[in-house]
UniProtKB/Swiss-Prot annotation:
<dbReference type="GO" id="GO:0044205">
    <property type="term" value="P:'de novo' UMP biosynthetic process"/>
</dbReference>
<dbReference type="Pfam" id="PF00215">
    <property type="entry name" value="OMPdecase"/>
</dbReference>
<dbReference type="InterPro" id="IPR001754">
    <property type="entry name" value="OMPdeCOase_dom"/>
</dbReference>
<comment type="pathway">
    <text>Pyrimidine metabolism; UMP biosynthesis via de novo pathway; UMP from orotate: step 2/2.</text>
</comment>
<dbReference type="InterPro" id="IPR013785">
    <property type="entry name" value="Aldolase_TIM"/>
</dbReference>
<protein>
    <recommendedName>
        <fullName>Orotidine 5'-phosphate decarboxylase</fullName>
        <ecNumber>4.1.1.23</ecNumber>
    </recommendedName>
</protein>
<dbReference type="InterPro" id="IPR018089">
    <property type="entry name" value="OMPdecase_AS"/>
</dbReference>
<keyword id="KW-0210">Decarboxylase</keyword>
<feature type="active site" description="Proton donor">
    <location>
        <position position="95"/>
    </location>
</feature>
<dbReference type="GO" id="GO:0006207">
    <property type="term" value="P:'de novo' pyrimidine nucleobase biosynthetic process"/>
</dbReference>
<dbReference type="InterPro" id="IPR011995">
    <property type="entry name" value="OMPdecase_type-2"/>
</dbReference>
<comment type="similarity">
    <text>Belongs to the OMP decarboxylase family. Type 2 subfamily.</text>
</comment>
<keyword id="KW-0456">Lyase</keyword>
<dbReference type="GO" id="GO:0004590">
    <property type="term" value="F:orotidine-5'-phosphate decarboxylase activity"/>
</dbReference>
<dbReference type="InterPro" id="IPR011060">
    <property type="entry name" value="RibuloseP-bd_barrel"/>
</dbReference>
<keyword id="KW-0665">Pyrimidine biosynthesis</keyword>
């Protein structure tokens, strides 16, 4: 089994590091002339799949699918399958986090053998990093990845993430825990991955980001474009093994034409190509 890190490394080398997002805001559905329901959601996603077929990895924002109940989850399942059929890795932005058997159930859904299981999933560590163990173990066993929230760009996160625990910030302690998890990952399951299966999320506009030099895994960097992150400034995040700039609104507002969405994404991919 080829691990997530190895698949990601190959995909980024061939297709660049940009991670376009599928964020079907109701406002975007309206702007694209689509109905704000599951039918409009499906049409929106079909356009995105066609536009992003040549990219390494794509990030659907799960909340916008959940809003439509079971019909929305059906669209998400089909979108994940369609992207993977195009050879695109899928990062489900679900931000799951819980404890014990509940975390194990989330792990089965998003990193096990489930129609919702993507190549990787985002997770929240703020019930304690150890609470993520069922998800980390399930991901490695199935050749999938996990991106753990570390330093987000929303102002509400500053008080918690920049709090000092011992002699490091909470955000740095999360990065360090993920680095340790990468070192401990089963070598047989990793199959010689040049990049570990576990990454972190660090916002593009975060001031004084955590030190990523020892992470040994990928870094998802949301907030590029409309949210203020500058593509040319991302190299300052440090010697991370793989930076994945994530962009949604900056690209999606070019729609609804497939060619226009693709062209907007390709322009940004060219701007961050120096990271690959």
């Amino acid at each position: 089994m080829t691990g997530f890190g190895q698949r990601l490394d190959a995909a980024v080398s061939a297709r660049g590091p940009l991670c376009p997002g599928i964020d079907p805001h109701p406002e975007l559905l309206n702007a694209w002339g689509l109905t704000v329901d599951a039918e409009g959601l499906r049409a929106f996603c079909d356009i995105c799949v066609a536009a992003f077929a040549g990219f390494a990895i794509v990030k659907p924002q799960v909340a916008f699918f959940e809003a439509y109940g079971s019909a929305g989850f059906a669209v998400l399942e089909d979108t994940i399958a369609a992207l993977r059929a195009e050879g695109v890795l899928v990062l489900a932005d679900a931000k799951r986090g819980d404890i014990g058997s509940t975390m194990a159930a989330y792990a089965a859904a998003w990193a096990g053998d489930s129609p919702l299981a993507a190549d990787a999933v985002t997770a929240s560590p703020y019930l304690g990093f150890g609470s993520l163990r069922p998800l980390l173990d399930t991901a490695v066993a199935n050749g999938r990845g996990v991106f753990v929230l570390a330093a987000t760009s929303n102002p509400e996160g500053v008080g918690l993430q920049r709090a000092v625990a011992g002699d490091v910030t909470v955000a740095q302690s999360i990065v360090d825990a993920v680095a340790q998890a990468n070192r401990e990952a089963d070598p047989a399951a990793r199959d010689g991955d040049p990049v570990g299966p576990f990454g972190v999320v660090v916002g593009a506009t975060v001031a004084d980001p955590p030190d990523l030099h020892m992470l040994g895994g990928p870094v998802l960097v949301p907030g590029v474009g409309a949210q203020g992150g500058r593509p040319e400034a991302l190299g300052g995040l440090g010697n991370a093994r793989r930076l994945l700039p994530a962009v949604s609104r900056e690209v999606l507002r070019a729609g609804p034409a497939v060619d226009d969405v693709r062209a907007a994404a390709e322009r940004l991919r060219d701007q961050v190509a120096y990271l690959a």
